[in-house]
């Protein structure tokens, strides 16, 4: 896990995910949110080659658990192939904020914290 900004954690996930690994990651992320008092968690799945039904369900449960703790969650790195798989599996991501890449997710997170980034002139 990486602290990107005060109040913003990122969890880059790499490699094949199974239910056990996803569960361990969820528990670690929830504890880290408590430890740091972070308001927003970004789960980046750019490095995940495929998502099956069980993994997608664990991700949704993680988002729900994060919300129950009073924080927001953004899933980034949703590539076209993964998006098609999720739609094909009939999974309901309504209400889950997703972004195509980590940069867009961080931009949204900072906006939600009331921060803006601008280039120095």
Predicted regions: what they are:
Residues 4-26:
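STAS-typified acidic loop motif
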Residues 47-92:
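Amphipathic alpha-helical interaction surfaces in cytosolic regulatory modules
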Residues 106-110:
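N-terminal loops that bind phosphate or other acidic moieties
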Residues 111-121:
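Intrinsically disordered or compositionally simple regulatory linkers and C-terminal tails
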């Amino acid at each position: 896990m990486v602290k990107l900004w005060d109040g913003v954690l990122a969890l880059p996930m790499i490699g094949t995910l199974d239910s056990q690994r996803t569960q361990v990651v969820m528990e670690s992320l929830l504890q880290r949110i408590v430890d740091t008092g972070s308001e927003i968690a970004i789960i980046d799945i750019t490095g995940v080659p495929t998502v099956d039904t069980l993994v997608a369900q664990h991700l949704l449960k993680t988002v729900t658990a994060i919300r129950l703790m009073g924080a927001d969650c953004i899933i980034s790195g949703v590539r076209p192939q993964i998006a098609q798989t999720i739609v094909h599996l009939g999974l309901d991501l309504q209400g889950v904020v997703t972004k195509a890449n980590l940069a867009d997710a961080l931009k949204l997170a900072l906006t939600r914290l009331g921060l803006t980034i601008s280039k120095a002139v």
